[in-house]
Amino acid sequence: MRQHQVADQLFGGGEMGALMRACDWSKTPLGAVEQWPQSLRSALSICLSSRFPMAIYWGADGLLLYNDAWRPIVGDKHPWSLGRPAQEVWPEIWDSIGPEFAHVLATGEGVFHSDERLDMHRYGYTEECFFDYTLNPIRGESGRVDGILNVVSETTYRVLSDRRTRLLRELAAKTSAAKTVEETCALMVEALSSDPADIPLALLYMVDPEAKAACLCTGTEPPPAVPYQPEQVCLAPPQSAPQASQGWPIAAVVQTAQP
């Protein structure tokens, strides 16, 4: 059977199916489609037919194949990522997932994680991501593990939403009994300091009675990347404010009452 006939039967529909049909696999490490082992064909058929995010990492190098639902997980690395070794696709998290891949291939035991944090670089910047995922062995005709089936659900938005909701509750609980402005500010900073992942820096400024300047009252411990926190910020219009205040749009916030 010719390669295009095998590909038509194997890859089915969908965006990824069309992309795989258009690929000349004979020029890749996977080789011509008609030479693929039945175990890979069967696993890929299940993967491409599923509406749940699934990917296959095949062979010792973990050559990556995936379905339409999994494609957003790789972000802007698609379509370059298709057919690439796992370590090339995920260098930023390989220290975390590489040993797990090796474990599955060596032992035939699956791996499961819930709300696992992985700091991924998939849209041009590093982002904090969370996933429920499994790594499941795919056994070949010889009985050994020849590949890994990755079933995954991204939970980033839920995890971040839950974490930020907890912070708001903590903020409300800590400040509810405060009796002075100074006490309120101190308790606010205490609450904000509990979540450095979402609030790496918080500075609380108090506006003077004449509304001419905002003075630093308190704040969280600044990270190394933020060496400068002005003690006082002029609330004059930008064109008349001192140079040191022009990078801090506090005046606009005070004047418009908008964030």
Question: What does each of the following model-derived ranges do?
Answer:
Residues 1-3, 153-163:
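PAS-associated C-terminal cap
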Residues 21, 61-85, 190-193, 197, ...:
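GAF sensory/regulatory domain recognition
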Residues 21-27, 38, 45-49, 92-121, ...:
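Soluble sensory domains of the PAS superfamily and closely related sensory modules
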Residues 33-66, 197:
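Sensory modules in modular signal-transduction proteins
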Residues 39-43, 59, 167-175, 180-196, ...:
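Amphipathic alpha-helical coiled-coil segments that mediate homodimerization
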Residues 116-118, 136-141:
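Output-coupling edge of small sensory domains
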Residues 123-125, 138-144, 210:
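Flexible loop/coil segments at beta-strand boundaries within sensory signal-transduction domains
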Residues 133-134, 144-154:
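PAS-family sensory domains
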